[in-house]
Amino acid sequence: MSFSKNMMKAKEEVLEAVQPYFRPVEAIAEKNTLKVLETMRACKVSDAHFALSSGYAYDDIGRTKIEEVVAKVFGAERALCRMQFVSGTHALATVLLGILRPGDRLVSLTGKPYDTMQTVIGYDNPSAGSLKEFDVLYDELPMKDGKVDLSGIAGVLKDKTKMVLIQRSRGYSMRQPLTIGEIKEITA
């Protein structure tokens, strides 16, 4: 099978036309790849860290080392990298259920959370294993015109508020995702 010269010329023209869009993405990817590689080198990751383990995770030097790398790459205090977490909501549920206790209060500053997080909270129905079933209180600050109501934050934070939820993504709503700058403004 061969392609006509016109088809090949069109392909080259399209590739050339999209390069201004690809270059910035490729530059970011290269920068981040180098950041990860430099962090792996600084953490002294070797082939030994990728060897099989017993599966029970006792003395799993590989997992411990990779968590060290991930924490440093993302500028975090610690990282938890487990294949047992099957989704982002699963990881968030682990954090919420591990920290919040009966009588504590979780407040969403970005209005109604996305559907799977509503299940974790027990939003409309305190289902088995939800925060509401464990008597964790939940409240939310509705967004105004797709933006966080900065003037309403102080009024919604009360004595028993132990944790604040800021949902960056829009979930299934029509609002725009929050920018890092907006999150900094919320947390200032």
Feature-to-residue mapping (PLM):
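Short, charge-rich binding segments
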Residues: K72-V73, Q84, V95-P102, S130-K132, ...
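General beta-strand structural signal in soluble alpha/beta enzymes
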Residues: L80-M83, S108-L109, L165-I166, A188
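Intrinsically disordered, low-structural-confidence terminal and linker regions
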Residues: M1-M7
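Catalytic cores of large soluble enzymes that bind and process phosphate-bearing ligands
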Residues: S54-G62, M83-S87, P142-D145, R175-L178
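Conserved beta-loop-alpha segment that forms the PLP phosphate-binding cup at the N-terminus of a helix
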Residues: A79-R105, P113-D124
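PLP-dependent aminotransferase-class I/II
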Residues: D115-Q118, Y123-I183
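Glycine-rich phosphate-binding segment of PLP-dependent enzymes
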Residues: K11-A76
